Amino acid sequence: MRSNDPNGIIELGNISLKCIIFTVDENNNSKILSTSISKSEGIYNGTIVNLTKASSSIRSCISAAEKEAKVSLKKISIVIEQPEFLCTKFSKKRKINGAKIHKDDIEFLLREAKKEAQVNDAKHSIIHIFNHNYIVDGKIFIEEPIDIFADYLSHEMTFVTMPKNNIKNIKQALIDCDIEVERIISCVFALAANILKNYELQHGSILIDIGYEKISLGLFKNLALVHSITLPLGINHITKDISKVCSLSLKESENIRNNIDFSFEENIELFDEKKYLKEIYFVESKYRKISSSLIENIAKARIDEILEIVKKQITITGLSTISGTNIFIVGGGSKLLKLEKYCSSFFGFNVNKLSDYEKKQNKIIYQDDFSSCFGALKIIKDGWETEAIPQPSSEQNKKLNFFAKIFRLKL
């Protein structure tokens, strides 16, 4: 990335595409030249399902940003999250035999882990590698234990991969727009980079991005993404459940979903004094008695299913037992009424709705529309302390830590 050259980032979502164009000067200060949002077509959960429609909608979004910025992009970085993403943790060990640990020892373990990842998932490509921690003779080291005398060295890493064919389809969609893909960045990683503080990422945080058709989970510790998963379940599934069970239209069901109080206390907005759904919610369907218990049980059943899966994913990492772990919910689904209260009860943790949490902390960096794009900008501009950066530029090299410098990753 050359100083003052225009750079672009586009997030590929189910409902909308979001693009930013920016520059970075010689002092590493970024400047946003333009932003654009357009309707997403041909893309489902980060996957290209119709190349023609996807290319057209991507071209429209990028062109709008280019027109506003009065520039023409040659390359662009992609922010996505797919259920097909795989997050794999590796722990590699090497005998040191009482000698000092050298750079070559760590480089060897990194390459061994990469080799195993490529063998295990031959149809996947690596998009992120994170250093979790080092274990020297049974003791945990957060930083590189160079020049430490030891008998054994273990290195724990997290690899995030995605199907090669999915990458090919994304690249083809951009080629059809006469633009190359610079790099691919996990959306949950980008969100965390933008909206969580370093101490939250250091001591343990769980980010739950609740979307329309999917939910993405990111678990962070020691500034590294230690586990992530995307579930093909979202708040639209609640809408479809209500529609199916209550024989209501999707439009009516969505309106009902948006007015459910997820603390499941008395809801006078949605139900009458006899606890039946109010007549005003029957816009396209004939009025009939639908009890509050039926609608609440439908919503609760789907939310419980989703949260139970998330809870199991948190439990297997052990992060839920760490003192001080924070849980945050973000995304369109986090705006459901009092969902954070229900999540807090379910997990046994204090769950913060991120927009509310930001207000309490007097922070202004949370911008719902472009949050993941701004996080990706930060990652691209500054690098990330625990990540092996794909093909870093000479300007970035000065800022990268030892881990990133000794291991280069190519998609």
What are these regions (language model features)?
Residues 232-254:
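A conserved active-site cap/scaffold subdomain adjacent to cofactor or substrate pockets
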Residues 15, 262-264, 322-346:
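Glycine-rich phosphate-binding loops at beta-strand->alpha-helix junctions
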Residues 313-321, 325-332, 352-358:
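Hydrophobic alpha-helical bundle architecture
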Residues 1-16, 20-75, 79-206, 224-226, ...:
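Nucleotide/phosphate-binding catalytic cleft detector across ATP-hydrolyzing
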Residues 31, 211-213, 342-359:
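Acidic-glycine-rich active-site phosphate/pyrophosphate-binding loop
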Residues 240, 297, 301-308, 312, ...:
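Feature representing long, continuous alpha-helical segments
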Residues 353-401:
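Glycine-rich phosphate-binding/hydrolytic loop that grips phosphoryl groups
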Residues 10-16, 81-82, 207-214, 220-223, ...:
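A short acidic Gly-Thr/Ser loop motif
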